[in-house]
Design a protein with these regions (language model features):
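Core nucleotidyl-transferase/polymerase catalytic module
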Residues: 1-185
Length: 185
């Protein structure tokens, strides 16, 4: 990322981080997700969902559908639109950003939180718990399968080896729990 772009991207990232905090998503602390993973491993009521290559999968189109036009305009102004390949050719990007961009982490958190909240509202979940930290998503088990479908429809791939809906094991933000016991390697 060009240095000047990065400066503006970080500014957008900070604004997104503040907006997320107002919604109860604290990107400076992973312990909420870790605690919910613990509870999910004990009670079985919460699922932990992880995505493959999430940072490289947030498309321009999903952002256009979810974000206000002024936010989208600001992000498009400071994002890298092309990548130069080793052979010297350039390739147009259809994703909003990649890791290394100053707002990717905050934006992917917002997108996954919005989709998870929408699913919980759509199916009228009894347990409306939604916790998101990057691509580490926690929702009630009743919402998990529908959320996985919605994520797939939006172009995201679930990491099946790190997604736990059933059984006594849960993992989120680097912590692994089996029946309430920390089994983090």
């Amino acid at each position: 990322e060009p240095e000047l772009n990065m400066m503006f991207q970080r500014g957008i990232g900070k604004l997104l981080k503040r907006k997320l905090l107002r919604a109860g998503i604290d990107l400076s602390d992973q312990t909420r997700n870790q605690s919910l993973a613990f509870h999910g491993s004990v009670m079985g009521n919460l699922a932990t969902i992880d995505l493959e290559a999430a940072s490289d999968s947030v498309s321009l189109e999903i952002c256009r559908q979810l974000l206000p036009p002024d936010w989208m305009e600001a992000m498009e102004l400071v994002r890298c639109k092309y990548v130069e390949l080793p052979n010297g050719s350039s390739h147009k990007l259809h994703k909003i950003s990649s890791m290394g961009n100053g707002f990717t982490f905050e934006l992917e958190t917002l997108v996954f939180w919005a989709l998870a909240k929408a699913v919980c509202d759509e199916i009228d979940c009894v347990d409306k718990t939604v916790a998101v930290y990057g691509d580490d998503i926690i929702v009630s088990t009743e919402a998990a399968h529908r959320l996985i479908e919605v994520l797939r429809a939006c172009g995201f791939r679930t990491n099946h080896e790190k997604t736990f809906v059933d059984g006594p094991f849960r993992e989120s933000c680097g912590k692994h729990f089996f029946r309430g016991r920390d089994v983090t390697p």
